[in-house]
């Protein structure tokens, strides 16, 4: 969605990688701090509510807002766009896997090692990374992709809330 405005230069890809790595760290920090300061029960209640927040925001779309900034300060514009369109959902999703592992571990004293959830999460991420450019991107227009994302995210949010 940003490539038509900025192109596919290495600086665009590097900036996006930087943003997503930083957002991943923010998600992990939120998980760690929340569990440490709030405990499992309060953190589960907070996250079960927070996971719904991205669905209340407007759909993800890159507009020409700030197009003048894009030509003068493309990196600043790109960081603004990714932060405002995918920042919150990404941070929430990044924090969900470690939280689910902790919830699983503390839900039952007889619970076994929760790290199989981490492996399942990585396998799902890899499958999505492979499927998107081969199936979704060429076959579905952007608006349908966004609709599928919102429906899928709603299902994930409901399942996470049920776990919390």
Which residue ranges define each predicted feature?
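Alpha-helical transmembrane segments of multi-pass membrane proteins
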Residues: 1-164
């Amino acid at each position: 969605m940003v490539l038509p405005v900025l192109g596919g230069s290495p600086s665009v890809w590097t900036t996006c990688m930087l943003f997503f790595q930083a957002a991943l760290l923010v998600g992990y920090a939120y998980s760690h701090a929340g569990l440490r300061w709030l405990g499992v029960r309060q953190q589960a209640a907070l996250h079960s509510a927070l996971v719904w927040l991205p669905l209340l925001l407007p759909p993800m779309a890159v507009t020409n807002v700030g197009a003048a900034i894009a030509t003068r300060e493309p990196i600043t514009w790109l960081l603004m766009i990714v932060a405002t369109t995918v920042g919150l959902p990404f941070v929430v999703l990044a924090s969900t896997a470690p939280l689910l592992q902790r919830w699983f571990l503390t839900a039952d004293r007889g619970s076994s090692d929760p790290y199989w959830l981490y492996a399942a999460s990585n396998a799902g991420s890899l499958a999505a990374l492979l499927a998107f450019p081969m199936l979704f991107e060429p076959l579905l227009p952007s608006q349908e992709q966004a609709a599928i994302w919102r429906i899928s995210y709603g299902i994930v949010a409901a399942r996470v809330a049920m776990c919390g």
